[in-house]
Each structure stands twice: as structure tokens, then as C-alpha cells.
Amino acid sequence: METVPPAVDLVLGASACCLACVFTNPLEVVKTRLQLQGELQARGTYPRPYHGFIASVAAVARADGLWGLQKGLAAGLLYQGLMNGVRFYCYSLACQAGLTQQPGGTVVAGAVAGALGAFVGSPAYLIKTQLQAQTVAAVAVGHQHNHQTVLGALETIWRQQGLLGLWQGVGGAVPRVMVGSAAQLATFASAKAWVQKQQWLPEDSWLVALAGGMISSIAVVVVMTPFDVVSTRLYNQPVDTAGRGQLYGGLTDCMVKIWRQEGPLALYKGLGPAYLRLGPHTILSMLFWDELRKLAGRAQHKGT
């Protein structure tokens, strides 16, 4: 893998993930709706306006129009730029310091970088989730915040809850991205090395990164989905005047309530769309990042 300065990795990582976000945001809208459907209700006791992936896409398009499938895109791009810029920058610093060469170093570096990125990007993810949940009453799931724009949402949250209100749900976001980042970066590096060792493809082919991203995406979805469901619930729940959540007290409380009231499988709600979103997003992000690093590395070598 090409070595580039951490500041360059910040730009490349943010750019790669923003590119991926444009393609995968419609899947994020569907996944968010499915994860909020039947919130804290026993299976079979609530209406289900969203049934599976294809039917859910159609339901969103009928209710909100085709552009409704790109709800929250601006906030999503802001989140991807902030979170992944910080994440790849911190991971690059760890690589530069040789920490990823130590046993378990890739996992630890990925987790720490993910935690920092999640904290910085949390306000954007909060707004993205609330915007994507919004729809007409006939197919509405979860609490409806009725924001009009990203700036309008920012102003409303700031006015009603203060600065700390922008970090509502961060307790679910940090572990979500920690496990996802650790799984993604560790398995991508290992998968790429394994594919190169098999010599099925030219060593510098973009197909190596594509194969590595495909393997990595499976690990990411398996470990991340329960935290993703919890994070969606924490971000979208209504809060009282003191900024406290009215449905959940935090990560553990949310997990326990989902388990008890909806059953353990509810922690994997929206798994199909989650893979259809996280899978391609992981594959495209890692592919774009790897290829952009190659280009930056070559440009750096030509300039010396």
C-alpha cells in the first residue's frame, strides 16, 4: 500500500467516502426506516409500511418521490467528510508511527481512529438520521422531528437543547464506528494481502482492492448492525426539555429494551438493506481510498 502523509490521507479518505455516500444514500434511507419500524413493540403488533428492500424502496418513492431516496444526502456527505477525514488521518498517524505493525495494532488503531471520527461527525449523523426518518403520516415510523433543511435542523436543536444537544446519541455512535472501523481496516489490510498472495490478480490491480473491500464488507456488516440499530434509535428519539432521551437512557438501556420488547433478532432489523448499504459503501470507500492513495503516492514520487 502506498505511503502518503496523514494530511493527504485525511483528504483522500473523506473524498472516497463522500463519493461512496452519493451511491449508497438511498439504501441508508431505507435502512433507517426499517430500523425504526415497530420501535419498542412486539413483533406482529404494529403496521408495517416497509416490507423488505424492494418494497421499501417503492414505499419511500411513492410517499416522498424519487428524490426522497436521497433524503439527508447533504448531512450524510458532511458526516462522511468529517468522520472519515478524522478516521483516516488518525489511522495514517498510527501507520506512520509503526503501531499497525504490532500484534493487534491494526484493530486497535482502527477502533481508536473510528471513535474519534464518530465523535467529531456525530452532529451531522444526528441530523441525517432525523431527516431520513421524516415522511408523510401514512408511512411514518419513529419520532418525526419535522426539520426542513440541514441548517434548520441545526438551528432547532441548538435553540431547544443547546450545544450538547448536537451530540445526542453519541454514546451509541462511538461504539458503532469503533467496531465497524476496526473490522473494516483490519480485514481490508489482511484480505488485500491474502488476495495478493494467491497471485490471482496483478499485484497493483484495482481488482485487488475491490476483492479486499468485498471481504471486509461482510465483517463490517456482521459486527456493526446491532450497534447501527441502537445508534439509529438513540439519534431519532424525542428528548425532554433537559435534553434527556424519552425512550432510552443510553446504549445499554436501548439494547436491553430492544431485546426484551422486540426480541433479539430486532438488533439485526434491516440487515438486508444494511448489507446492501454498508457492503457497497465499504467496497467503494476502500476501493476509492486505495486507488486515490496510489495516485497520490505516484504524484509524490514524481515530484521528488
UniProtKB/Swiss-Prot annotation:
It is found in: Mitochondrion inner membrane. GO terms for cellular component: mitochondrial inner membrane. It catalyses: a dicarboxylate(in) + sulfate(out) = a dicarboxylate(out) + sulfate(in). Its main location: mitochondrion. Putative antiporter that exchanges dicarboxylates and sulfur oxoanions across the inner membrane of mitochondria. Belongs to the mitochondrial carrier (TC 2.A.29) family. This is Solute carrier family 25 member 34. It comes from Homo sapiens. The lineage of its organism: Eukaryota, Metazoa, Chordata, Craniata, Vertebrata. The gene is SLC25A34.
